[in-house]
Amino acid sequence: MKSAGCGKMRTLQDGAGTVLSGGKSRKYTLRVPDDYDNNHPYRLILSFHGATGDSSQVAPSYFGLWSLSEGSTIFIAPDAVGGFWSADDDVTFVDDILEQVTDDLCIDTSRIALEGFSQGGAMAWTLACARPNVYRAAVVHSGGGLARPASCQPVAFMSSLGQQESGGAGQTSNSDFFAGQNGCTVESLAKAPRGGHACSDYEGCSAGHPTRWCDYDGGHTPSPNDAGQNMSWMPQEVWAFLSQF
């Protein structure tokens, strides 16, 4: 579905942006394809940094998805106040970003997705639960720090956690939670081999709500490498998941 910004001359430019939210000027970083066409509705991915961080930890690579998207996607990295996300104020903040951006840029409002790391991952699942009719999918890397709302509804969901993290070693509570919401069969999933990774799809999920889990032998990071490899395997896994929508 085309947003109100389709057909308009854009005023928002790449780089730092601001929006008034809750009476405060809030910041985010925007990246639009170089050959942007104001009549073409783009996928939008919102990328959330971890605790104590800011959008510079995410932009300009957006967890490695920018290069993989090949001009198909607009990316936004919001900034948390003081580096920490709030389940209340920041849901409204992201609402306000979306209102501003969809009014100015040509967005496919049926293909808005979330990705976040650590507390930013928790912010992604909070938004997926709070606004299930807005977000098509959510990807959570090592998410923690915010409570899951009780009002969660089905949403396509992917998560990952390292075996060497606190609460790791096969801890699938995030993915199991959303698997339950999505009507999937909660089952024993593949474990990563030493120095490697293993990704698994839950079975029996409701139509349009695939649920995927990635286990890896590593620590607290959104971009783990397999042993002996210089490049992370995670961006390709995430892009394969999100680009199906």
For each feature predicted by the language model, list its residue ranges.
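Histidine-bearing beta->alpha loop at or near hydrolase active sites
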Residues: 82, 193-199, 213, 217-222
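Short beta-strand/loop motif that positions the catalytic acidic residue
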Residues: 158-161
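Acidic catalytic loop of the alpha/beta-hydrolase fold
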Residues: 164-168, 220-222
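Alpha-helical scaffolding within the catalytic cores
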Residues: 56-67, 96-97, 141-150, 193-203
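Serine-hydrolase catalytic machinery in alpha/beta-hydrolase-like enzymes
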Residues: 5-7, 15-113, 126, 130, ...
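Conserved beta-strand scaffold positions in the cores of enzyme catalytic domains, especially
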Residues: 75-77, 210-215
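A domain-start/cap signature at the N-terminus of enzymes
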Residues: 1-44, 88-89, 115-139, 143-145, ...
